[in-house]
From Swiss-Prot:
Similarity field: Belongs to the protease inhibitor I7 (squash-type serine protease inhibitor) family.
Site location (Reactive bond): K8, I9
Gene Ontology cellular component terms for the protein in this record: extracellular region
Keyword Secreted: yes
SMART domains, per the entry: PTI
Keywords: Disulfide bond, Knottin, Protease inhibitor, Secreted, Serine protease inhibitor
Domain remark from Swiss-Prot or TrEMBL: The presence of a 'disulfide through disulfide knot' structurally defines this protein as a knottin.
Disulfide bond annotation, renumbered to this chain: C6-C23, C13-C25, C19-C31
Alphabetized InterPro entries for the sequence: Prot_inh_squash, Proteinase_amylase_inhib_sf
GO molecular function: serine-type endopeptidase inhibitor activity
Protein task: Inhibits trypsin.
Protein name: Trypsin inhibitor 3
Amino acid sequence: HEERVCPKILMECKKDSDCLAECICLEHGYCG
């Protein structure tokens, strides 16, 4: 399967749109 494109940068988030590229906002409050 295709991997999501997600830069390995620790970014805080409240929702997926706070994150770069195809990262999603994970339960611990950071993009991944």
